[in-house]
Amino acid sequence: MELAVGASEATMRSLLGKLGNLLAQEYSLVSGVRGDIQYINDELASMQAFLRDLSVVTEGHNHDNRRKDWMKQIRDVAYDVEDCIDDFAHRLPQDSISDAKCSFILTKMYELLTWWPRRDIASRIAELKVRAQQIADRRNRYGVNNPEHCDSSNSPRPRAHAAAQDIAEYQDTKPQIVSIKEPVGMKTVMENLEKWLTEPQPDKGRAVLSIVGFGGVGKTTIAMALYRKVSGKFDCQASVAVSQNYDEDEVLRSILNQVSKQEEAGGSTESSSRDENTREPQGSSSTSSREENTAESGTKRMLNKLKKALPLSLLGGNDDKTSVRQQETMGSLQLREELKRRLAEKRYILLIDDIWSAKTWNSIIIPFLPSENDKDSRIIVTTRFHAVGSTCSPRHKNDEATSSPGHGKDLLHKVDFLTGDKPLDLFNASIPDPMKRTDRDKKLSKICGGLPLAIVTMAGLVACNPNKANSDWSKLCESLFPYPVTTLNLDGVTRILDCCYNDLPADLKTCLLYLSIFPKGWKISRKRLARRWIAEGFATEKQGLTEEEVAEAYFNQLARRNLIRPVEHGSNGKVKAFQVHDMVLEYIMSKSIEENFITVVGGHWQMTAPSNKVRRLSLQSSGSKHGNSTKGLNLAQVRSLTVFGNLNHVPFHSFNYGIIQVLDLEGWKGLKERHVTEICQMLVLKYLSIRRTEIAKIPSKIEKLEYLETLDIRETYVEELPKSVGQLKRISSILGGNKNTRKGLRLPQEKRNKAMKNPSPQGKTKEPAEKGFLSQEKAKGTMKSLRVLSGIEIVDESAAVAASLHQLTGLRKLAIYKLKISEENDTFKELLSSIEYLGSCGLQTLAINDENSKFINSLYNMSAPPRYLVSLELSGKLKWLPEWITSITTLNKLTISITVLTTETLEILRNLPSLFSLTFAFSLSAAKQDQDTVKGILEDNKLATDGEIVIPAKEFKSLKLLRFFAPFVPKLSFPDKSAMPALEIIEMRFQEFEGLFGIEILENLREVHLKVSDGAEAITKFLVSDLKDNTEKPKVFVDGIVTA
């Protein structure tokens, strides 16, 4: 195993910055300590230089145990110094002495009051100095050689450019969209497998497709492509990853949740991601005693265990459908029973990814499948082992066994290594930018032994080294594999991943290793990751770029290198979510273990618990049997905690609240109000996510989190923030509300006494009845760092809040999920004024959901339009298109009400030079109330152009995505092939549809996706069927089904 130095060097760099800041403080240090800190600073700087030399000179060599142990000592002392400094920062009130010119007496009082903590820290620093001296002496004593003494002539590292990489090169990427991609060189195979999955079996029984092959050969890629293509033909679908170390309850619960959500959606054009009606918020009733909150009695625990063990039939649970909250408390027996009941009368398709043993199939999967199901259901299984595949598909075609009654014939498909020209074709297809094709490509694809994972990763390496000479690539091939390669084994895969990892700059190594926090197969949000990188200090201001821009550049480079796989793009063309390949995740996890960078408890792989201190903890287990899985771990130095799954217990009492900086509890159902109170004691916390938890209130003590940068409370029961949130000086992102249900988060405002609200004789109020959350004395001048304010609610009583928005001059995104104000109210005028002002300050994203539509229509003649907008969303009954939209040359994404869908509107919008996606929408909930009105408006709109909406020729030069989401979509026509020349995808969701004409002449249009909601009339179904059956190009998908 190679010596990993990426994360260690990044930690050292961050630490040196903190030491420099500490030395600059005039009043904080006890006499004599400044010299110790300076010594530690100089010693660690030399160690950092040594680390950097190691990463450049000696990577590709196996390091002896002495160097590895010495590196471990460097890392440990650096971590301990960082903890000491962070502890110092929160124990001493720096601002009170440094922000003012204090008198001699005040200075002495400060020194007296802080004498004890400063003395304690001085003692710890002295000990750390001694440790640093000992580490330096030990290196000489035991002969740890300098990097220049090591021979690097055979190093496989293509390193000419990486250390000095210009990150601005990767800051901006061209917007693009993800579509269903065929695995390279497998067109015929995919067609055959798709046909087998969709054609009925003679006895209409359940059938299993097992896809078998070596890790990295493309099993999951094939399975996912098939699943996405055919899933729309089934009543319900679910996919789950199992892997080597799985949790039975979590596997079953994941499948059940997916099936349940599809039933709840009922085929409508909009659906909620959670059941808002069946779950009660935490804290909505009277607060229980602390003893009741902190521990259950033995009797209660016994009853809960008994309930989980009993079948639902004995608990009276078969009468009605279980709620999401009930499912979260079910045991395995109840989960199996509920799944069997829900699937019994449905035609289902399941994707079970990465099964490692026949026991898993027989004991976990088979028990929940209905024994009698004649609906032609299908199961897709992926596994590395032929024996497991044969167990899952016992009646596959290579066997002489015939189908048994009630079951269809199974299929086992083996995925082999690529041969012939296929490796080179995949290599060329995996390089994002056009590059000159040379013999280099053939040589590099050949050493990958036909393994797709190795090929695409090596192609990413080439893409990021465009100026490297062919001779250097030839040397690289020879150093990696001196002998010809036919097929690649695990050691060969590791060599190639080593080569690609070693080419990364130190910052990118750290960012890549950080991904080992997430579970196998997890769909990772790009924005969530970027905010966490910033909070951890991995992405800092550099080369004139902001932290956010640097984080985006790092992400783009990892994607360009094919070390991560984008799986979902937003309508703005940027990556929304991505995944890490299983083998890449295993690789970076091994590196993280070596550096003690990430500690994972639970998850899909068995991970040896570190004997040293835990720094970043990822809890991935689920269920009560994992509740005490952190026993034996030293958690006093945990700086980052992430929870995945339904843990019953998280050991908050074991953490040092003074050093935790990242707390990501998204989706943890065990979070209680008392936990949130404890979180407010984590004084250096920078990132807090309690998204999708059952918390209903944020305590006022949140003001103590003066370093907090991100507060994510989306999809919780929190309806209003406390007034103290206005005192968070460093807050950058406040994310609240629920976009699916349009539930908004109220910003606080302070009520004034009634005497101040009495009108004057002229009928006017003497002063506002409320104060906005930024109008309080303590909050004045704060929140200047706020960049994102998303998911808020503005109503008639929010005039003070609307006025306070003026002060958020750094705001880049404002999303109002619920707006309900009357035109004569002061709130109307204040909000309009605030939006005009923020638009002039650099607002880039504006989203407004206006329930009565008066406000969005008032934007038409706005005197100072937001000229820097990149994304604009206006929801409601829009009467006319704001005339200033055409002046916004930076606009990339536009979502507007379908009520302004006219040929004239399209004529106006076609000249926007940067427009990537255009969406006409109307929410289903609003349409139910105004269905006749909306339909009448659309009928009038099309009458102006002979009964159809005509897409104008030419222009729309950048538009690649066109979407219509509404109950009624009128007739649309593309009369000229020059209309929307860059268009790649059309998406439509509707209940009533009048037709789509001329799409076959659009040269770049690849896919049309149609989703028909329940209740559609026969004429609509006929038009959809006709479009599907009579269109060869582009491909037409109806509810996910691609045309033949």
Swiss-Prot record:
Cross-referenced Pfam families: LRR_14 (PF23598), NB-ARC (PF00931), Rx_N (PF18052), WH_DRP (PF23559)
Keyword Kinase applies: no
InterPro entries (UniProt xref): Disease_R_plants, LRR_dom_sf, LRR_R13L4/SHOC2-like, NB-ARC, P-loop_NTPase, RX-like_CC, Rx_N, WH-like_DNA-bd_sf
Region (Disordered) residue spans: 258-302, 737-771
GO BP, one annotated term: defense response to other organism
Ribosomal protein listed as a keyword: no
Domain of life the protein comes from: Eukaryota
Chain ranges of the NB-ARC domain: 187-543
Keywords: ATP-binding, Coiled coil, Leucine-rich repeat, Nucleotide-binding, Plant defense, Repeat
LRR repeat positions: 635-657, 682-705, 706-728, 808-834, 840-862, 866-888, 889-911, 935-958, 980-1004
Molecular function via GO: ADP binding; ATP binding
Region described as Structured coiled coil (CC) domain: 3-184
Family statement drawn from the similarity comment of this UniProt entry: Belongs to the disease resistance NB-LRR family.
Function as written in the Swiss-Prot or TrEMBL entry: Probable disease resistance protein. Resistance proteins guard the plant against pathogens that contain an appropriate avirulence protein via an indirect interaction with this avirulence protein. That triggers a defense system including the hypersensitive response, which restricts the pathogen growth. At the opposite of cultivar Kusabue, the cultivar Nipponbare doesn't recognize the effector avirulence protein AVR-Pik from M.oryzae.
The protein's name: Disease resistance protein PIK6-NP
Species classification: Eukaryota, Viridiplantae, Streptophyta, Embryophyta, Tracheophyta
Gene name, Swiss-Prot/TrEMBL: PIK6-NP
